[in-house]
Curated annotation (Swiss-Prot):
Any one Gene Ontology BP term: proteolysis
Protein known as: Cathepsin B-like cysteine proteinase
One GO MF term: cysteine-type peptidase activity
Protease in keyword set: yes
Family: Belongs to the peptidase C1 family.
Protein function: Thiol protease.
Residue ranges the record assigns to the propeptide: 1-22
Organism whose genome encodes this protein: Fasciola hepatica (Liver fluke)
Record keyword Hydrolase present: yes
Keywords: Hydrolase, Protease, Thiol protease, Zymogen
Domain of life: Eukaryota
EC number from the UniProt entry: 3.4.22.-
Length: 32
């Protein structure tokens, strides 16, 4: 299972939030 938090680390919080709105696994720990 990929580590999304590490994968999206370089991205901005806005982009992370936008990506989180798409269909990602519930395990995705996004900072909201």
């Amino acid at each position: 299972k990929p580590n999304y938090k590490r994968q999206f680390e370089p991205f901005s919080d806005e982009l992370i939030h936008y990506i989180n709105l798409e269909d990602l696994p519930e395990s995705f720990d996004a900072r909201q």
